[in-house]
Every structure is written in structure tokens, then in C-alpha cells.
Amino acid sequence: MCSLGLFPPPPPRGQVTLYEHNNELVTGSSYESPPPDFRGQWINLPVLQLTKDPLKTPGRLDHGTRTAFIHHREQVWKRCINIWRDVGLFGVLNEIANSEEEVFEWVKTASGWALALCRWASSLHGSLFPHLSLRSEDLIAEFAQVTNWSSCCLRVFAWHPHTNKFAVALLDDSVRVYNASSTIVPSLKHRLQRNVASLAWKPLSASVLAVACQSCILIWTLDPTSLSTRPSSGCAQVLSHPGHTPVTSLAWAPSGGRLLSASPVDAAIRVWDVSTETCVPLPWFRGGGVTNLLWSPDGSKILATTPSAVFRVWEAQMWTCERWPTLSGRCQTGCWSPDGSRLLFTVLGEPLIYSLSFPERCGEGKGCVGGAKSATIVADLSETTIQTPDGEERLGGEAHSMVWDPSGERLAVLMKGKPRVQDGKPVILLFRTRNSPVFELLPCGIIQGEPGAQPQLITFHPSFNKGALLSVGWSTGRIAHIPLYFVNAQFPRFSPVLGRAQEPPAGGGGSIHDLPLFTETSPTSAPWDPLPGPPPVLPHSPHSHL
């Protein structure tokens, strides 16, 4: 089991991490191009330094037309109709109970009793699921994979799956699209685009971007040849469903055929047919909502986390699921191996990384998830003291988010900061991983930014063929792209010494997406038996749920 005591010391203060070479992280005094041996392999990406000053905080005022008219007293039934549309049942009962005329006394009394009963039921439901009492903004901030979502200028970052293009959601609710081959930066704005929580590019499409907003989902269709920097709102398609707000997570199927959405207040995952603007629910009756969705790269499974101490894994053939309860808290973050045979996840309140394997392969038309009985602990991130050139430094704690690169050889973990501890800022841990023939997790190093900068989001480039490319959003507004140069263990394609890409094996393609899927040796015991071996296990037992 890997622990923080095995990590090399962090870089000296004032140094920033530039790239990885020979399994070591190279630092410098500032963000600069790699040495001459590497400059030929450097990809052309825009350098972003976004500050909070020019970004206006999104307004929270009501921009409706109600305040433009002179107030006059309406009849009670008209007021109830308007309140039903704006507030719902609670507002109607409150209006009738507090009306002074036009209502019989027994109607007022009955409405008062019904209002008290509804409030009691609401408080009971809120005690079971405390997150339902939060405002929409607080809900998004609570379950966002970015640290300090409420006040950071970089809220969401999403790479395009096939090209050097990415989208960034900013504090002012605008979304900017950057392309390495173009100087034009479209800025997407819409009156419904508020509190953006997730961005998702449609696979196998050059121009379709899904945006998760407070009240809906916007599907932007951008013309790659357009010279406009402000696409009109007519380029956006609106998807919405009652009770499915705020939307906190989006996930396209790897084939691009389906779009999944999740909301912490809706117990059902919504599967959207974008062309007809209709959705089909994937319901369950426990968990109080869905916070995050993550489709496995092979398209066979979907991880669905909840606000409660349970998470589910769905299979995408017959749409059945299995559930794994956790011991202390909800699933905080997770990531899939490239072949979908392994899930790494963390639990809120625990400084541990768990591994859950899926050795069973189901045939065509058979609905089964095939997960192991229990999860094993593969890394202990408990706080420890590390000797540095500047003295002792405490490192460790809980993980906030975690990403696995498409080659399956690098894992980045964004650790939570501790405001009460001196220098208790968030840090990024980098691991070397191997998923076949046996799973390995080894320390690589600690990624550091400019003085005073704290990491807020991390993600890997989906198709970087020279190793891995880690993109980091910092609290200063800078988006840094850190290349991790290494030779792929299964299909060596890049040699930093030669400075050129090597040819893949016969029959293999030049892209990661064209390579055969990794495989794992499955045990000879029953499918539900835990994998053999001495690692400690915790009882995360699945229970079938259709």
C-alpha cells in the first residue's frame, strides 16, 4: 500500500513544476518552455492568465417585469394561480391561510393545518437529507470537483476529446472556448446560463458543448469556421425537466449517443435524447439525489455518486445497477481505468484511496455490472511530516478530486487544504500507476505552482500521445499545462531522447483510442468472491438494485 512517507520532498519554495522527465518532476523559477531537447515536442496551447477583477460577479437580482408595473390588489384565486406557478404548493397554502377576505374561515383553518403538515414533512425529509435545505449555489459548491467554487474565477474546465480545444466556465457565468489553432475566443452567454457546474463536449463532434446550469442544460452548437466571438443565444438548445435543478453533472456516452445529467435534489438520473429534447429517468428510491456522473472510457459502466453514504455503478446494456455502501461518508470523487476494469474512489472524511475491480465480462445483451464484493485500500494519504530544504512540512489529508490519464500510467490527486493549519493549502500528488497484469500505485512527486497560488481543478488531456498532459487551474487565474513525458509501458510511442514519436506495433493505431483495451487476469473463484491477496479490505458490499 502506498503512503505519503514514500513521496520525494516537495519543490523548494518559489519553484514551480514544469514537466516530468525520467520519472522525476522538473521545476523552475517560472513557467517557461522546456529545455531545447523537449521544445520540439511542446504542443502549442494558449497561455491563460485570467484575473477576477475584469469578471463581474453574476447578478442575483430578479430581472423580470413584475417591478415595472404598479401594484394592485388581485382576487385571491388569481393570486393563488400566480403563486402556484412561481412558488408551488407551499406558497398557495400560505397565501390562503394569511388572506384577510374572500375566503371562508374553515378554508383558512384547513389551509393552516395543511401548511403545518407540509412543513413537518419537509423538516423530516430535510433531517434525512440535510443537503436539501441548502440553496442552489451552496449545493453546487458542496459537490463541485473544484475547490472554492463560489469565489474562484475558474469554475469548470473541459478538454475536447479529440482536438487541442478546451472550454472554461468563469465566475461571471460566461463560457470561453480556446483553440490551439485559432486566435478567436468565442464567449458563450445566455440568460439561463447561471451557476455553471459542469461542461461536457460531445464525442465524435467538433462543435457541440453541453453546459450544466442552475435551472437547465444548454446545448451549444458552435461553428468551427465562424469568426464571431459572441455566438447568439439561438445557437443554444435548452433542456429542462421539473425538479431536476440545479444540474451539477453531465456525462456523454463515449459514442456520443446519450447525454446523462444529475442533480442533488433529484433521485433519478436523466438520460437525454437531445434531438427530441426528451429524457428517460433511471430511478432509485434511496440516496436523496445524484451528485456526480462518470462514464467509463469503454462505455460499459457509469459511476453515480450520491449525497448519502452509498454510490452506484450502472451498466449501459440493460441499465441495471449495483450499490456499494460506505462506512463514514459519501463518495467524494472517483476515476476509471482506461479499460473500465477498475474504479478508484475516495470517501468523504477518510484519507484513503480505494480500488474496486470489475473482473467479470458480460456477454452481449446480458445486464450485469460484475463488480467485486469489496474495495481494497491502495493508498493511505494520512497526514505525515516531510523534511524539506525549508524545514519540516506537514502533508496529507483528504482528497478533493482525482483524475487518471488515458494511458493508465499517471494518477493526479488534488488534496483538500486545511485553513486552520499553517501552510495547510491544497496540493497535487502525482502517482505512477499500472493496471495490467497487476495493479500498482507508486509515488512520483508533488506538483507546485507559483508562490501564493493554490490548485483548484485538475484534468488530463484526453489524447496526448507523448505521455500525459496535466492541466491545472490555479487560484491566480492561470491555467498551466504540465507535460509528463514517459514511454507507454504497453505501447511505447515516444522517446524524449530521440525527440520523435516511435511507431506503434503492427496493427496498432497512432491514437490512444485506437489501442486495444487493457485486460486483467480474473480469479478462478466465483465472480462475487473478493480478489485474492493480502491488502486490507473494507466491507463495501454490493446489493443488486433494479
UniProtKB/Swiss-Prot annotation:
Motif (Microbody targeting signal) on chain: 544-546
Presence of the UniProt keyword Flavoprotein in the record: no
Pro residues bias (residue ranges): 529-539
N-acetylcysteine modified-residue sites: C2
A matching Pfam family: Beta-prop_Aladin
Residue numbers spanned by region Disordered: 500-546
WD repeats: 142-180, 183-222, 234-274, 280-316, 324-380, 386-433, 442-482
Cellular localization per UniProt: Nucleus, Nuclear pore complex; Cytoplasm, Cytoskeleton, Spindle pole; Nucleus envelope
InterPro entries associated with the record: Aladin (IPR045139), WD40/YVTN_repeat-like_dom_sf (IPR015943), WD40_repeat_CS (IPR019775), WD40_rpt (IPR001680)
Disease: Achalasia-addisonianism-alacrima syndrome: An autosomal recessive disorder characterized by adreno-corticotropic hormone (ACTH)-resistant adrenal failure, achalasia of the esophageal cardia and alacrima. The syndrome is associated with variable and progressive neurological impairment involving the central, peripheral, and autonomic nervous system. Other features such as palmoplantar hyperkeratosis, short stature, facial dysmorphy and osteoporosis may also be present.
Protein name in the entry: Aladin
Lineage of the species this protein comes from: Eukaryota, Metazoa, Chordata, Craniata, Vertebrata
Gene: AAAS
